[in-house]
Amino acid sequence: MSVTMREMLEAGVHFGHQTRFWNPKMAPFIFGHRNKIHIINLEKTLPMYQDALKYVRQLAANRGTILFVGTKRQSREILAEEAARAGMPFVDSRWLGGMLTNFKTVKTSIKRLKDMEVAKEAGATETMSKKEALMFEREMDKLVKSIGGIKDMGGIPDAIFVVDVGYHKIAVTEAAKLGIPVIGVVDTNHSPEGIDYVIPGNDDSSKAVALYVRGVADAILEGRANAVQEVVEAARGGDDFVEVQEG
């Protein structure tokens, strides 16, 4: 589903930060300012957003994994919902240093969480003392909060989608170190440098954030559906070219 400029306006995508907090590297994407607030040029944002979605679609069609990252209060809930809808991993609580660059260690925690889930399912907490059960639940809750969204990731993602690149600069740095492409929402107070697919836009409004993450989730589902359709059509097409050898 394609997004229009009107929808971007209604979601407040064009509202940047106060002019005194601006990053000069965002100048090419700024239309002007009003009441000391920078206004982002949506004529630049819309095609760049569409480019990002095109990349997402292609990646999803090739069975790629995109890690959603958004831990700010206004993006947390919708980001987790949309990532789950698209069947993609997400980080919505806190970015743990080394989540990408030290994935081997993170895998140990994932295994621990999965083992605990299996144990709980089997009724392990029922045979524990009250104190043990409480400790177990606390540890499990902590793991779910920190790595629950990536427990089925399996390995390093093919790309990461970040809402607010400044707030998540550790995630962006780790991705760059590993050569993982970054799709990022960049507001007027941050730098677009090092971001492979820049989406110049408001990163604070929950309406704007919902627009970005829904769009990315839709693009993933479209990419997957298109890939399935191509396989079906190729199989059908194969039937048309079967030569019948006459004896």
UniProtKB/Swiss-Prot annotation:
It comes from Ralstonia pickettii (strain 12J). One of its GO terms (cellular component) is cytosolic small ribosomal subunit. The keyword NAD does not apply. PANTHER family: 30S RIBOSOMAL PROTEIN S2 PROKARYOTIC AND ORGANELLAR (PTHR12534), SMALL RIBOSOMAL SUBUNIT PROTEIN US2M (PTHR12534:SF0). Signal peptide: none annotated. Belongs to the universal ribosomal protein uS2 family. GO terms for molecular function: structural constituent of ribosome. This is Small ribosomal subunit protein uS2.
